[in-house]
Amino acid sequence: MTVLKMSDLDLQGKRVLIREDLNVPVKDGVVTSDARILASLPTIKLALEKGAAVMVCSHLGRPTEGEFSAENSLKPVADYLSKALGREVPLVADYLGGVDVKAGDIVLFENVRFNKGEKKNADELAQQYAALCDVFVMDAFGTAHRAEGSTHGVAKFAKVAAAGPLLAAELDALGKALGAPAKPMAAIVAGSKVSTKLDVLNSLSQICDQLIVGGGIANTFLAAAGHPVGKSLYEPDLLDTARAIAAKVSVPLPVDVVVAKEFAESAEATVKLIADVAADDMILDIGPQTAANFAELLKSSKTILWNGPVGVFEFDQFGNGTKVLAEAIAESAAFSIAGGGDTLAAIDKYGVAEKISYISTGGGAFLEFVEGKVLPAVEVLESRAKA
């Protein structure tokens, strides 16, 4: 995968438009989770250090396209950036006709989704974005799977289109895990339904040596192997699909599970051998023996991809399986990559972030990349690099 990288470019005196993913939660005009802003800071600082006139753009929320809405304004993000950078970051609302930014200065453009044609990737709007800059930098991996004006269209028309450090690091990490992974490779894919992760399971079954499944997905594989799952969430119409995947790759199944009679924070947890699961039991986590078995597989792996907690870890009594696997990944010498919202929450809960090789910032984009799909915003950078 060959793209131009912002870090390799001479930006002195250049007008640089950086597309970041600053779509953060805001309450009462204050940013409540700053992870995405923090992730963007090194790119912004590097562009400033290189002497560029920096313009940053992003979307926030889902406003009606072409209409301003105060609740989707990037004003709280501009305020946050001003504090984080120790300098004023003006929010510019009217920028499509041109903006006066001096080298070494920075402005934040108002929500790109206030512009008509953004979602539809209209060429006219994309050309207006491109006219604002000498260099366009795509740094928002989380939106790379969407072909929109500020992620894809502008890259077609800008004089130079490059990947920012955040996007480049993401592509390098995913390429390392999926392109030619060090073997043996283990993948953990968990979630409520096989149907929503079918492409991920099929794609990974072709490259990994051990495909560990969890959650409702594991229940479907258990049922497909003839094991009782009680009243657990599973998909009876996908049993043949589960068998077909298990025929292609080793899918180690739980030997014991943690069950309850109800799905509730106060539910009583009971460990049972898989054969002893009763008709009124719900499987809500893998059992301790299974967790130990899976942990051994992970510790002997050279590449690990993790997407999804293996139990209802939000309730502590059903969190042991996810905790044990998280710690095994942290202790492993393998190259490890993790992605997906629930996965990130589990990583936070068990404090293993520092010991995972790479944590992906993109939910949908991460999954689409794992599925083997082309990400439009990356594809256009590749085609521009070849030109």
UniProtKB/Swiss-Prot annotation:
Any Gene Ontology CC annotation: cytosol
The keyword Transcription is annotated on this UniProt entry: no
Keywords, in A-Z order: ATP-binding, Cytoplasm, Glycolysis, Kinase, Nucleotide-binding, Transferase
Binding site for ATP: K197, E314, G340, G341, D342, T343
Cell compartments where the protein resides: Cytoplasm
Pathway annotation: Carbohydrate degradation; glycolysis; pyruvate from D-glyceraldehyde 3-phosphate: step 2/5
Entry-linked InterPro entries: Phosphoglycerate_kinase, Phosphoglycerate_kinase_CS, Phosphoglycerate_kinase_N, Phosphoglycerate_kinase_sf
Catalysis performed (reactions): (2R)-3-phosphoglycerate + ATP = (2R)-3-phospho-glyceroyl phosphate + ADP
Main location per the UniProt record: cytoplasm
Gene Ontology BP, a term: glycolytic process
Quaternary structure annotation from Swiss-Prot or TrEMBL: Monomer.
UniProt-recorded name of the protein: Phosphoglycerate kinase
